[in-house]
Amino acid sequence: MIQIKNLKKEYRTNNTSNLVLDNINLEIKQGEIFGIIGHSGAGKSSLLRCLNLLEQPTDGSIFIADENITKKNSKQLREFRKKVAMIFQHFNLLSSRNVFENIALPLEIQGIPKSEIKKRVFELLDLVELPNKANAYPQELSGGQKQKVAIARALALNPLVLLSDEATSALDPTSTKQILALLKILNKELGLTIVLITHEIDVVRKICDRVAIIDKGRIAEMGKTLDVFLNPQAPVTRSFVETSIHTKVPDFIAKKLQDNPYSYDNTYPVVQLTFYGDKGKMPIIAEISRQFNATASIIQANIETIQDQIVGIAICHITGERQGWENALRFLSNQDVNLKVLGYATADNI
């Protein structure tokens, strides 16, 4: 659906230049919700605005639905932009127009007959669950309702792609939840491809199929959302993930860990076990005690939800005879769970 090849964006002022996007390559599949996350100034907004050429790339190419949009002239681009809609953090509704008129605006610009406009607007109001707000003005709406109107307006011309520029950043938690639920419905019911940029990792966690992490104008990491959350590779990714799910080892444990299990007598492994899906039903900790004459003491455990997938994360201290805990580690490494040895500690030090 969307291919970005060797994309660069540089801002030049007088004798200075600022490279905000450096050799970006990624592919977004049709019908997926793709998240782009990064800290302020990472380049994510510039990347999104390049996707509809609100920002002209300095170099590289962008293909949407097999069309190279970077090669289009102004007239061709105006026509193509009907296929790529956009919503914004601050809604951008016209205060002088009511809800009906705001949604109708792109249809009016296209010269659609009034009877068709009326039908389409009320279809969209039903779709975004605001059937009784046609005559209300933006100042009479909550933030979540304003964003729903903005979404309805964006969908007026039946786009292939919806670009979301920090669309939940100005909303309260309840409204954020409602907007994310609506985007998931639109994605499934309309087959709408959604490209979502945000600095909120929980937004990615809840609805994105895949995610790219941008840092200093480059893609630091990219993959399926569940994979990225459970096994983050780049430091910037780990910093985001640790604010969303409890994967970080508590400081009071970390400072007691040794790298070498044989540095001291009676030193045993501290491990992190991650279960998800049907894997959580396996009695692995009980099996350790039963098979290997070892004890797995749970230090910390929590349940998370990533993209409607239940994920369990447990930090355990495995104690017992050396052969027993070594066999237990081998057993765990062969099971269908994620195993990470965090370090080693004595039984009375955790």
UniProtKB/Swiss-Prot annotation:
Q: Where is the ABC transporter domain positioned along the sequence?
A: 2-241
First-level EC class = translocase
Q: What are the GO cellular component annotations?
A: plasma membrane
Q: How does it sit in the membrane?
A: Peripheral membrane protein
| A UniProt-annotated Pfam family | NIL
Q: Which GO terms describe its molecular function?
A: ABC-type D-methionine transporter activity; ATP binding; ATP hydrolysis activity
Q: Which PROSITE patterns match?
A: ABC_TRANSPORTER_1, ABC_TRANSPORTER_2, METN
Which protein is depicted? Methionine import ATP-binding protein MetN
Organism annotation: Francisella tularensis subsp. tularensis (strain FSC 198)
Q: What is the lineage of its organism?
A: Bacteria, Pseudomonadati, Pseudomonadota, Gammaproteobacteria, Thiotrichales
